[in-house]
Structures are given as C-alpha cells and as structure tokens.
C-alpha cells in the first residue's frame, strides 16, 4: 500500500479556495472508506440531503447553520468556528454556509444498496414538493446535478398543496 502525504488545510485553502463553487461549494479532499470534504461559503442550496449514514461537521472558519427536520419540526443548529457536530443518519438537513466560512465534512462511503435522497420542501407551507433518490458514489458531483435538474424543472418546483413556485436557491 502506498500512503498519501498529510495535507496542510490552511495552505490548501489559500491555494485552492477558488475550487469551492456554488451551489454546493465542496471539494473532496480524501476518498476511500470515507469522503472528507472542504466546504466553503456562501452556498446556494435549498435542498435537504438525507443520508443513511452519519455525517461529521467541523467548522474551521466562521459560523454555519445546519437546517434540519427533527421529528417533523424544522430547526436550526448553529455550528460555530471550532465546533464539531455529528449528525445522526436519516436526518433531512440543509447546510447553510455564509460568505468567508469554511468547514470540513466527513461522510462514510455508502454501503451497497443504501441510497441517499435529496428533498425539497415548499418554502411557504413546508410540504415535500420534490425528492430524488440515488446511490451516491461521488459527493463532488451527484448532489450538484440533482440541484441543477430541480432548478430547471418548473413543475418540480411548484407546490401541489399551495401553488408556490419555489426556488432551488436559498433566499
């Protein structure tokens, strides 16, 4: 086995910060059993990701807001600079990152047959308006692809309950 070299996170961010682009703003730094991502802000997401494995958040710079749906109730969890947070499996969550913020997120590779979901709730009445399910193999591209498709689909963005046309971008 050939081992990789340690990565100096501060230096990496200085040299590669331009790689953190909307709508997700992530870059997969390490892969293999786990994916370790550097995630910058601001991001432009209104989706809620549902992962059947836990997710670990470490806030390297600034504060982020992790919007979650906990037992049917919408809540905000603020993760401040220097804080870490372990999100349990199957919690719908929307990571809201602000300008000049940087976090590190660790996700377990998905076991065979275990799918992720990306879900959108109506921004007015909170009804589920759209959901896609897929086997996640690439955190760097697949969630972004789902967001781009949702953004282009007026029918998917229109709430059948109240008629609101929702944005794929966070207001």
UniProtKB/Swiss-Prot annotation:
Enzyme Commission identifier(s): 1.13.11.6
Binding site for O2: 45
Superkingdom, taxonomy of origin: Eukaryota
Binding residues annotated for Fe cation, in chain numbering: 49, 55, 93
Subcellular location, record wording: Cytoplasm
One GO process term, biological-process aspect: quinolinate biosynthetic process
UniProt pathway: Cofactor biosynthesis; NAD(+) biosynthesis; quinolinate from L-kynurenine: step 3/3
Function: Catalyzes the oxidative ring opening of 3-hydroxyanthranilate to 2-amino-3-carboxymuconate semialdehyde, which spontaneously cyclizes to quinolinate.
Name the UniProt record assigns to this protein: 3-hydroxyanthranilate 3,4-dioxygenase
